[in-house]
From Swiss-Prot:
Source species: Mycoplasma capricolum subsp. capricolum (strain California kid / ATCC 27343 / NCTC 10154)
ZnF (CR-type) ranges: 139-221
NCBIfam families: DnaJ_bact, PRK14296.1
SMART domains membership: DnaJ
Entry protein name: Chaperone protein DnaJ
Names of the cofactor(s): Zn(2+)
Family (UniProt): Belongs to the DnaJ family.
Residue sites binding Zn(2+) 2 per the record: C169, C172, C195, C198
GO biological process: chaperone cofactor-dependent protein refolding; DNA replication; protein refolding; response to heat
Disulfide pairings: none
Gene behind the chain: dnaJ
Amino acids binding Zn(2+) 1: C152, C155, C209, C212
Length: 372
């Protein structure tokens, strides 16, 4: 069966950034994860999504894929017959699960637990948090709510009504695996496969837990407090270990990955990594007279003595009032204020008379040279 294009699988363009690919993967993973999606094709779809993300989120693999397509990772072209010994033969059978001839027996018989029974880490969860400029600057504590797979409190994740309802699978004798015979050319060998009776669990549940209907887990709405420290930047991540979905076979929970984004602002902008640029309106009279004004900033009100005759688009620099240069440290960038001189559209009769008197007495004339 012909494989789908990895970019099509994730629904992104071939020029998509790593962030766009990561966001597309998270969206699809939430939609098709078998623990959340019970449709019969969810498992195969999730395998396809994981395979595509594994390649496209790895710079080297993506480069190979863009150049050669699926052929770059095609291991199905057969096996060479020019082996020097049996160890060479089995070391090349990457698809059989054996790393070399010397550990065939340990793969068959040396483990008390199959891959299907081993504890596995729970699925990690990714969420996006959008911060205001003030929250980004000073840090903030957020309470987030999300649905997480949690081990059943009644059966503690076993899925059984009681311990006596858990029986060893007679087909695989509790290993979760059975041996199947494979033919490859002139060679015949055995390979372990997941037991189709117990689905790799190694056990059969007689009476299922009524609380979780035998699943061992259920979705539970949880509130989680997230501390976002000062000094964090947009597009950075915070990882809360073991705050994700519950694990399988008593493994550790997955992680909660928080992607930080900045809400759009009409006032503030980040420049030079650590500086904050803001536009501030100033009265035309304050600019002419060089008055002391109150500038409202994210740090609060700041008194500032204007230089006389400051013009629009000139910058006022207030040191150490920008972003924190690193997480939970006190060194900061600068606040750069771009001045915008505001002239009133409506004047009182008295104001207009006074300005006309000044106009009649002034010799000021701004230069305009159209030949420059």
């Amino acid at each position: 069966m012909k494989k789908k294009d990895y970019y099509e699988v994730l629904g992104v363009s071939k020029t998509a950034s790593e962030q766009e690919i990561r966001q597309a993967y998270r969206k699809l993973a939430k939609q098709y994860h078998p623990d959340l999606n019970k449709s019969p094709d969810a498992h195969d779809k999730m395998v396809e999504i994981n395979e595509a993300a594994d390649v496209l989120l790895d710079k080297d693999k993506r480069k190979q894929y863009d150049q050669f397509g699926h052929r770059a990772f095609d291991n199905s072209s057969g096996f060479s017959s020019n082996f020097t010994d049996f160890e060479d033969l089995f070391s090349n059978m990457g698809s059989s699960g054996f790393s070399s001839f010397t550990n065939i027996f340990s793969d068959f018989f040396g483990s008390n637990k199959s891959d299907y029974q081993r504890s596995t880490k729970g699925q990690s969860v990714s969420i996006d948090i959008y911060l205001t400029f003030k929250e980004l600057l000073f840090g903030v504590d957020k309470i987030i709510e999300l649905d997480l797979l949690t081990n059943c409190s009644a059966c503690f994740g076993s899925g059984a009504e009681s311990n006596s309802d858990i029986n060893i699978c007679n087909n695989c004798h509790g290993t979760g695996e059975v041996l199947v015979q494979k033919n490859m050319g002139f060679f015949q060998f055995q390979q372990s496969a997941k037991c189709n009776v117990c689905n790799g669990a190694g056990k059969i549940i007689k009476n299922k837990c009524k609380n979780c209907k035998g699943k061992g887990k259920y979705l539970e709405r949880k509130k989680i407090e997230v501390n976002i420290p000062k000094g964090i930047r947009p597009n950075q991540q915070i990882k809360l270990s073991q705050k994700g979905h519950a694990s399988t076979n008593n493994g550790v929970n997955g992680d909660l990955i928080i992607d930080i984004y900045l809400k759009e602002s009409k006032v503030f902008e980040i420049i030079n990594n650590n500086d904050i640029l803001m536009t501030y309106n100033i009265s035309y009279l304050d600019s002419i007279l060089g008055n002391e004004i109150i500038i409202k900033t994210l740090d609060g009100d700041i008194k500032y003595k204007l230089p006389k005759s400051i013009n629009s688009n000139e910058a006022i620099i207030i040191n150490n009032k920008g972003l924190y240069k690193s997480i939970n440290k006190d060194k900061r960038g600068d606040l750069i204020i771009k001045v915008n001189i505001v002239v009133p559209k409506n004047l009182t009769k008295k104001e207009k008379e006074l300005i006309e008197q000044i106009y009649e007495q002034t010799s000021f004339n701004p230069e305009n040279n159209i030949n420059q």
